[in-house]
Amino acid sequence: MKTAPIALVLALAAIATGCTTTENSSRNLGDPSVHGKTLAEQVCSNCHGVTGNSTNPTFPRLAGQHEWYLIEELKEFRSHNRLDPAGYEYMWGLSRSLTDAQIQELAAYFARQKPGADQPENAKLENAGKAIFANGIPSEGVPACTVCHGAEGAGSGQFPRIAGQHADYIVKQFNVFQRSAEERPNGAAMKVVAHNLKPEEIKAVAAYVSTIASK
């Protein structure tokens, strides 16, 4: 049966992370006639939140992300080209039966949601991150984050939105970029940047970025 492995993946994810699911939502994943908005509300919401503003930093905030980027990443998960642990643990099974139309609809749904952000907690750390974000670290070969992601972290037609993303998730992705060229095949620029940043610098940038509110 086509939906049994998917239901198993959902059940395992629920046990491991506290995400909840239902029999009906797992069935919907194998049905190409189900609209992406329905999948977003009944399936994706279990981990990412109904509005794409997840409360668990294991799962990224999707609200306000560029539609093109969400489409690209969902297709990378579906084709198993994205090899980071979160990819194969959670997204491979969930995305494998998605149609192109459903991916488009999911991306459009989350792209139009209002993004959130974390409240500032550590001014010293966040200010250090803000300086790197705005100016880079020329002596270490690190360009300003604004060059690609914009002054407010909103991204562009080539680079994703990072403003308001969970700090822990950002750190995790930096670690992925540092670890292997294969895990995130579309992140050539970030691989160079990540290798030139120290752990404390990554933590500072992540802390600042997580507090950038929507503009």
What annotation goes with each model-predicted range?
Residues 1-8:
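Bacterial N-terminal signal peptides that target proteins for export
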Residues 20-40, 53-58, 112-138:
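Electrostatic cytochrome c docking/interface patches
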Residues 37-41, 45, 134-146, 155-157, ...:
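Sequence context surrounding c-type heme c attachment/ligation sites in exported
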Residues 44-50, 106, 142-152, 205:
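The canonical Cys-X-X-Cys-His
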Residues 55-61, 77-121, 156-161, 180-212:
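Axial heme c-ligation environment in periplasmic c-type cytochrome domains
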Residues 65-68, 73, 160, 164-166:
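Extracellular/lumenal glycan-associated surfaces
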